[in-house]
From Swiss-Prot:
Gene: GLV9
Residues recorded with modification Hydroxyproline: 86
Alphabetical keyword list: Differentiation, Growth factor, Hydroxylation, Secreted, Signal, Sulfation
Sulfotyrosine: residues carrying this PTM: 75
Source organism of the structure: Arabidopsis thaliana (Mouse-ear cress)
Protein name, as recorded: Protein GOLVEN 9
Amino acid sequence: MKKTSLKLMTLVLGFCFVIYLLQGPRGGSRNGDLLIARKLISLEPIETKNAARSLKDSISTDLEEEVDRLMEHEYPSPVKPRKRTPVHNGVRNRH
């Protein structure tokens, strides 16, 4: 009984030790990370809200124009109907 409890305790301690080793630093230095964070905080945003809004609007209009261009072959425009011949306009031939 003592041997199995000793093996179990050794196994649990070994597992805890492996977890502890895996939680160590992942490369780089903490001082370097802090310097990068300070540089990022000190930077001011380049775009204003109005510029961001106009950029978003221009993207949406570009997408709408692209969809219109792709769909114009499948759906004829109601604004520009095809020209009809005089027969279809109701003009009869007078012989």
